[in-house]
Amino acid sequence: MLIIETPLLLRREVRRWRQEGKRIALVPTMGNLHDGHMTLVDEARARADIVIASVFVNPMQFERPDDLARYPRTLQEDCEKLNRRGADLVFAPSPDVIYPNGLESQTFVDVPGLSSMLEGASRPGHFRGVATIVSKLFNLVQPDLACFGEKDYQQLALIRQLARDMGYDIDIVGVPIVRAKDGLALSSRNGYLSAEERQLAPQLYQLMMALSAQLDNGDRQIDILLEQVAEKLREAGFTPDELFICDADTLQPLSAASTRAVILMAAWLGKARLIDNHQVDLTV
């Protein structure tokens, strides 16, 4: 497995594989890899001849400097995991390589609508950072496909819109959420949880599934349902951040025409911001 830090060397390897007729998959990550990331690599491996994983903690998508500073950097361990899983190349650039003129002078990519709604409304600039780094990676690697986790539901929708709008001939593959046995969605930020908080954390998933059951039963009093969930989260020790029930295809409010809903949840538990989502079929 190759470990490369510069765009020049990355392009050289990509060019060689292209000349050999290889099908290339990209798995973008911010490192601190867990089993959820490994399923992305597995999916990429099953669909392509070459798997390129990026490990880059992207400063442009952090709105809080303290959050950026404490995000775990575990490159050596990440590379060992990726090597064992069969990745062919790890692109691990420094911020100076990706943003040589600094963030303030960096050309950026913004996806209208999706960047500023829902999670984007409370995290200004976050999705601009996501769209910019993903665009850079797409331009550098020019993959046939790219794998992203469905845990970041709005991010996945944004990247699909980005690919359509910018004309990228790239298959965007969504990979299902990987969960611990108790239901907690795997996340790099789970490492911020204390032992006691880790015991409480699955309640986010449990409350989400209870909400799903209410939707299955035909309850459409969305505001009341969300307030009930928020109160239960607070009682359990969480600080609710974002709670939405949207049309799964448009991320707009549910309408009579909606056939699928998505529950989007984010809540703080101690120092960890936990996110999760679940889709609900409204036609049954």
Swiss-Prot record:
InterPro entries xrefs: Pantoate_ligase (IPR003721), Pantoate_ligase_C (IPR042176), Rossmann-like_a/b/a_fold (IPR014729)
Entry keyword NADP: no
Catalytic activity: (R)-pantoate + beta-alanine + ATP = (R)-pantothenate + AMP + diphosphate + H(+)
Residues annotated for beta-alanine binding in this entry: 61
Single GO term (MF): ATP binding
Location of this chain's protein in the cell: Cytoplasm
Pfam families from the UniProt entry: Pantoate_ligase
Residues reported to bind ATP: 30-37, 149-152, 178, 186-189
A Gene Ontology BP annotation from the UniProt entry: pantothenate biosynthetic process
Root EC class: ligase
Enzyme Commission identifier(s): 6.3.2.1
Active-site residues annotated for this sequence: 37
PANTHER family: CYTIDYLATE KINASE/PANTOATE-BETA-ALANINE LIGASE, PANTOATE--BETA-ALANINE LIGASE
Quaternary structure and partners: Homodimer.
Note: The reaction proceeds by a bi uni uni bi ping pong mechanism.
NCBIfam families, per database record: panC
Protein name: Pantothenate synthetase
Higher taxonomy: Bacteria, Pseudomonadati, Pseudomonadota, Gammaproteobacteria, Enterobacterales
